[in-house]
């Protein structure tokens, strides 16, 4: 879901970081800004200013101030796009951070925009209130239904890099050139 829906479909960026990556270089920050002009990477920011992050409108909306049914509290946290510094994310955890929880509000908004623009074509125009109505109607009733609290002895990061390196490499997909009938 993280890879195919998050990256592939909604064009979201990673919300996790690796200590060894350090600060995002200026060239990458400029690339993120360009991607955002094209509608990509709506879930990360190149600034920590709550007035300027891509999800600023959600931060100002009372309907998102107390968190949502997924248990996500919107904020501005440093560490995203695999870098510890210079890129910010909207929540402490999410599908694009740990791959174990649902999508946060900025990610859900990006998914909504993509689905609606592809399904309705060029006459469709984004309406924030229509998104919020749809989003609020489809949230779980409470966070207990979607998030299982970790025990104190459980590791927070689901993907330990050293353990991942021990796994066998998967084969590349084989393309036959044949059309798949639908």
Q: What is the predicted role of each segment?
A:
Residues 4-20:
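Catalytic Zn2+-binding segment of zinc metalloproteases
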């Amino acid at each position: 879901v993280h890879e195919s829906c998050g990256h592939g479909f909604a064009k979201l960026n990673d919300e996790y970081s690796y200590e060894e990556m350090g600060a995002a270089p200026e060239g990458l920050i400029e690339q993120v800004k360009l991607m955002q002009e094209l509608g990509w990477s709506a879930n990360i920011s190149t600034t920590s200013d709550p007035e300027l992050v891509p999800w600023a409108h959600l931060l100002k909306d009372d309907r998102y101030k107390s968190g949502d049914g997924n248990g996500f509290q919107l904020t501005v946290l440093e560490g995203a796009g695999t870098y510890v510094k210079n890129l910010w994310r909207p929540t402490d955890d999410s599908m694009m951070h740990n791959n174990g929880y649902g999508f946060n509000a900025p990610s859900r908004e990006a998914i909504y925009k993509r689905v609606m623009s592809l399904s309705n074509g060029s006459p469709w125009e984004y309406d924030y209130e229509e998104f919020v109505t749809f989003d609020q109607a489809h949230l779980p009733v409470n966070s207990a239904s979607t998030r299982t609290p970790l025990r104190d002895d459980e590791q927070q990061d689901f993907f330990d890099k050293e353990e991942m390196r021990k796994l066998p490499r998967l084969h590349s997909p084989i393309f036959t050139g044949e059309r798949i009938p639908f």
